[in-house]
Amino acid sequence: MDNLNVFANEDNQVNGLKRPPPSRVCPRCDSDNTKFCFYNNYSESQPRYFCKNCRRYWTHGGALRNIPVGGSCRKPKRLKVDQSSISEMVSVENQPINHQSFRQTQENNEFVRSFDASSSATVTAVPNHFGYLSELHGVTNLLPIQSFRTMDCLDFGDESFQQGYYDVGSNDLIDNPLINQSIGGYVDNLTSYCINQVEPKLQPRYEHES
């Protein structure tokens, strides 16, 4: 019999077959007190085992720890994103840019620079609001810049006639015959335009006594 056992052991070693390890009984599953876990965190030398039933690691001689069932299965916390801040950022990016005010400012600056260059310079930059004055390219020897007075707003009933335009006084036009001959007609047009824009006042009606 002994010879048979020896031959059987030799055959198992030759074939590379090993006996399966004996099943270990989980002290937590075998215990009535299932609220505790047999695990020693501070003993690295002791081997630990994982139980598939209770999903716990346990060690021989481990200390009792008060851990409820499912306590080790922690789900990763998701970061909460503030939706209000995201919506504000998107709304700011989607806002259209107002290019109209920038264009009006640029036109006003170009108009002022044309007068600051020289008193005898040719009129080359005129805003779009005064399109009928574009024929004055050949007029020279204009009045100096001191004789012009600035107007914050031309009372034409239109908001576009604002900020940075110059007005020629009536005395300046009378003293300078060149200006009278060249732009006298245009001044008449301006005055007639101003008169037409003014709303006529309603005259009171008087009822005759019968």
From Swiss-Prot:
PROSITE patterns: ZF_DOF_1, ZF_DOF_2. One of its GO terms (molecular function) is DNA binding. One of its GO terms (biological process) is fruit development. It comes from the Eukaryota. InterPro entries: Dof (IPR045174), Znf_Dof (IPR003851). Keywords: DNA-binding, Metal-binding, Nucleus, Transcription, Transcription regulation, Zinc, Zinc-finger. This is Dof zinc finger protein DOF4.4. A zinc finger (Dof-type) spans 24-78.
